[in-house]
């Protein structure tokens, strides 16, 4: 699973992307829990539901199931 970060999210994670090979999250909600654990500065943004998630180039809802070969992009709010 590849997770891509954009804009100021890259600054918080210090990464443009990362690969999760083992024990990948099963849905967006689990991914959010993992991100909060790994990047505490993202927690308030994740809790406020201001970030957008796309799976394989399509925006998605939190209950969407994830597969090990998915590419997930995380975007901040845009005006």
Regions from the PLM with identified roles:
Residues 1-79:
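Ubiquitin-like/PB1-type beta-grasp interaction modules and other compact soluble beta-rich domains
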């Amino acid at each position: 699973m590849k997770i891509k970060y954009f804009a100021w999210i890259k600054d918080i994670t210090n990464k443009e992307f990362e690969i999760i090979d083992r024990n990948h999250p099963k849905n967006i909600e689990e991914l959010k829990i993992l991100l909060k654990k790994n990047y505490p500065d993202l927690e308030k943004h994740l809790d406020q539901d201001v970030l957008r998630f796309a799976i394989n180039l399509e925006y998605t809802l939190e209950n969407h199931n994830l597969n090990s070969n998915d590419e997930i992009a995380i975007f901040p709010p845009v005006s």
